[in-house]
Amino acid sequence: MSKLSHPQVLEQIKYGLIASCQPVDNGPMDSPEIVAAMAQASVIGGAAGLRIEGIENLKATRNVVNVPIIGIVKRDLPDSPVRISPFLQDIEELAAAGADIIAFDGTDRVRPTTREAIIKRIKELGCLAMADCSNFEEGMYCHNLGVEIIGSTMSGYTGGEIPAEPDYQLVKDLNAAGCRVMAEGRYNTPELAKTAIEIGAYSVTVGSALTRLEHIVSWFADAVKSAK
């Protein structure tokens, strides 16, 4: 955890960019040292905070930056579609590794641990909570349980075709209902990130367009190939 108080953490990320430093799994950049370097470079570039996946990545990053960190653990479970910080053990390890904010899957789906239990443990450990939600109802459910930040993270990722554009309406609706909204999901250009803040987001998270080099290069390579 940084040395910032909860109000200071929230103030620091307000209207700011969160850089999600999550390399492609098992790719050449998938190591704690490289994730920490990505994080440092992101902060130099102006990121107000970071989103880091994995305990070892979080530990390495916490050692080299002082900005707020949103910590998550991703898992692939045989009996649940929920991937983001699904167990109380995940919450405990993220807190111990230095997360200021712990994000969890806030969707209304089959899960190994209730949202209530996850939120309770986050608060017991002195961290802020962020719920990664897919729709307005889920966001309000978590908001009413005391979650400080509601993310649009899962919108478009719980079934069916993934939309090309971000879910602006969800950001607008949650903001209008009194939530601190983390706009996240398909904000892959500076203009889209700017729009998120303009329509009411508290902060905006950008991931692949900043830190997944394989994806970024493929966008350019595909565009160049299509020219002939």
Curated annotation (Swiss-Prot):
This is Putative N-acetylmannosamine-6-phosphate 2-epimerase. It catalyses: an N-acyl-D-glucosamine 6-phosphate = an N-acyl-D-mannosamine 6-phosphate. Transmembrane segments: none annotated. Its EC number is 5.1.3.9. It comes from the Bacteria. GO terms for biological process: carbohydrate metabolic process; N-acetylmannosamine catabolic process; N-acetylneuraminate catabolic process. GO terms for molecular function: N-acylglucosamine-6-phosphate 2-epimerase activity. The lineage of its organism: Bacteria, Pseudomonadati, Pseudomonadota, Gammaproteobacteria, Pasteurellales. The gene is nanE. Belongs to the NanE family. Pfam families: NanE (PF04131). InterPro entries: Aldolase_TIM, NanE, RibuloseP-bd_barrel. Pathway: Amino-sugar metabolism; N-acetylneuraminate degradation; D-fructose 6-phosphate from N-acetylneuraminate: step 3/5. Keywords: Carbohydrate metabolism, Isomerase. It comes from Pasteurella multocida (strain Pm70). It is an enzyme of class 5 (isomerase). One of its GO terms (cellular component) is cytosol. Converts N-acetylmannosamine-6-phosphate (ManNAc-6-P) to N-acetylglucosamine-6-phosphate (GlcNAc-6-P).
